[in-house]
Amino acid sequence: MFAKWAVLCVLIVPLLPAQEDSMPGGPSGLRCEYLTDPVGIDVPQPRFSWVLEHAARGERQTAYQILVSLKPDLTDGGQWDSGKVSSGQSVHVVYAGKPLSSGQTYYWKVRYWDSGDRASPYSAVARFETGLFDAAEWIGKWIGGANQIRKEFTLAGRPVRARAYVAGLGYYELRINGRKVGDHVLDPAWTTYDKRVLYTVYDITERLRPGANAVGVMLGVGWFKARALRLQIHAEMEGGQTVDVATDGSWKTMPGPIQSDSVYNGEGYDARLETPGWDRAGFDDAHWKAASLTDGPKGALSAQMMPPIRVVDTIAPLKMTTPHPGVYIYDLGQNISGVVEMRVRGPRGTRVQLRHAELLYDDGTLNVENLRAAKATDVYYLRGDGSQEVYQPRFTYHGFRYVELTGYPGAPKFDTLRAKVVHSDVRPTGGFTSSKQILNQIQRNIVWGIQDNLHSVPTDCNQRDERMGWMADAHLYAETAMLNFDMPAFYTNFLRDIHDVQAADGTVTDTVPHRYGSRPADPAWGMAYPLLTWYMYEYYGDRRILEQHFDGVKAWTDYLRTRSRDGILDYSYYGDWVPIEKTPGNLVSTFCYYWSADLVSRMAGILGKGGEAESYRKQADEIKTAFNAKFLNPATGVYGTGTQTAQILPLFLNMVPGDRRGGVLGSLRDDLVYTRNTHLTTGILGTKYLFPLLTETGNSDLAYELATQTTYPSWGYMVENGATTLWELWQNKTGPSMNSHNHPMFGSLGAWFYNALAGINLDTAKPGFERVVIAPQVVRDLKWAAGSLDTIRGTVASSWSRSDNGLRLEVTIPVGSQAEVRIPELGLEPVTLSESGRAIWKDGKYQSGPAGVTGARESDGTLVVEVGSGKYAFAMASE
């Protein structure tokens, strides 16, 4: 997968400005509710987004027209013809046509008019399909039984259209007429089952045939810790007849070859118990038992509108060793989430065992101590019919780099095992690379660590007896995830998960779904609710998310107020987790309380709730005053006990009184550089906010030195000690305590690579990258850096390289967006700046000329250039 991600990060080839009479191209990248051609959405008024295409610079959309129809050729907009709508909006356009029906496929296309009122061609036709809007439309009943369930049915002919609606808990695999349907694994996504159960819609038209058909479902316990199935098939026949098949007491069930399955402990599979043909018509199920009707979970059925978990890559081992006779250790060379596919041939009943771990002992044997109670072991009993047998677990996953193979009949080969990388299939959308190899490896480790921990919820780790949606981890690496992957549908679902656990008193929980940890959440953990809501608005311009979760975020903030005393929030469980130096918990909690109130005020202002915006602004100001009175030492001029985090947090949110800011910042800088020899002592919160703070205050060189540090504690120290993902602790620990070696909560650094080193930043005043700020930090010995990001509006990219006499910067801005490009003068004077060979700054003045460039000015050693959409190649040099 990393290779796929890496190709996204390329140096931009500058293009000459397009001719002014260039015509607009047809829109691309059509999305419905963030998804491409989704099958099964249950939003009555879905939103449409598209990417504008235009060869000319400085272009924008002035109007659009959307057609929606039941006809795939879209000869008319029978469902909705928006007409020509004068608007620059190309994201989150709300459907406003005839009411949508359940279980229906709709086709849509869009065109737009550019700044010259020239119409583009229509886009290619996209589609979306609705799920079931009304609970009464579910005719299938919840049934239970053993882990294999089947049903046969007859069709008079071949259907013209057929769909399966499936909710299977904890996990399921759907099979029709002997073959698996779809490529999802570990489906459905984990939710709070008492509130919400997700179902998936499958197009099974080509799987059904005239005559007898069979549907089979394998069930695993997953996070539900039981097995339950609700399914219905709706087939439309020629002539308009319909056939419905739904779960009820007539379905048959029998235990299958999966003898045990556990997320933590692994899977036990006895191939001797396979019953060939059980998922085909004509199978003799006379000895199978009738499935039992059950109440099922209490939660409402909801469409799974997010990227599913899939096998996204296959990795061959790097090497195989034999530390003891009969014990074979395979090294993948990379810490992953997933399972192993094994090929084996041998006597019937032979027991083969696969154990998984992140670490080895010095003697080369498997070290499973840090897995704690998780056994992470898959066991396979051979069928023994003389053929080659292939085994891959279905209802578990592991976090591992090493696999121990024992009990194998004969001598295994190098290719006996292959690893399958398994996680939520979020599309890579970003890339970063630079001239500094340690940064590139850290970026690689961050990307692997995040993707390994996206398993329908953002987890803390992927290997031990935990793997929870810890809320602090979720919000701390969220921005990095958004810069590297296509995350909006994933986080939309997770915000619903948070809403599902919220109690009437406003409290949320440390983990979501809630299986472990406290209620109420630690304030720093509860920050996931306001921050993820806010990030969805900033990165994707999603106002509907603000509308949906404003009351919930406000309720959480109101709860914090009930726990505060004179503006100070004293309760704290974790605070700035896993630091080198501990910061007082009440300082961290009060910081979070202030930020929650501040965000509620900002959200209220955006939503037109002026009274609440003013009220929560006043509340935030009162908290800030109390914070400074409590924690700022007037004698020493530092906060709390003087830790780095205690200074970082108030500096980051501009809570420090103006006359004290310089002193607090100076104390922080002195501690970093002199006291700690350019090392940090922060935990996960302080680390997240340190790097943007240093950049904002003109200390990017120091941030770079910290980021490239290779001695303890640092990311480079992890790399130097063989890490291929991020550790839970700064220390390199391998014992049975808290020491995961795949824990992305320190991955917040990755956002700084994009924001500072590549210089790609959003402007909250124009969210969703409608306005972009390109501000690369040209630091120390870094010779070049490049970053690219597929935003909801199109590609934003920035690539720079420097020489002794200047700087080259290449920039891409999406059609419909504008940008402020900040080019550091690097102490050169006087400077000239050209774009595609034409001067735009000379003799201290802006020189008009190139298309798309609308102005330039000089500010504090930086040339600030205003541009519209397009690709630009800037060259700065000394005159």
Language-model features: locations:
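C-terminal capping/lid segments that line or modulate ligand- or cofactor-binding pockets
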Residues: 269-270, 465-466, 471, 484, ...
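Active/binding-pocket-proximal capping segment
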Residues: 172, 180-183, 187-188, 498, ...
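Extracellular/oxidizing-compartment recognition motifs
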Residues: 20-105, 109-464, 472-473, 489-490, ...
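Active-site acid/base region of carbohydrate-active enzymes
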Residues: 171, 230, 248-250, 254, ...
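Non-catalytic C-terminal accessory modules of carbohydrate-active enzymes
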Residues: 232-234, 246-277, 304-313, 701-879
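Bacterial N-terminal signal peptides
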Residues: 4-14
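Alpha-helical support elements that line or immediately flank enzyme active sites
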Residues: 162-166, 176, 339-358, 392-395, ...
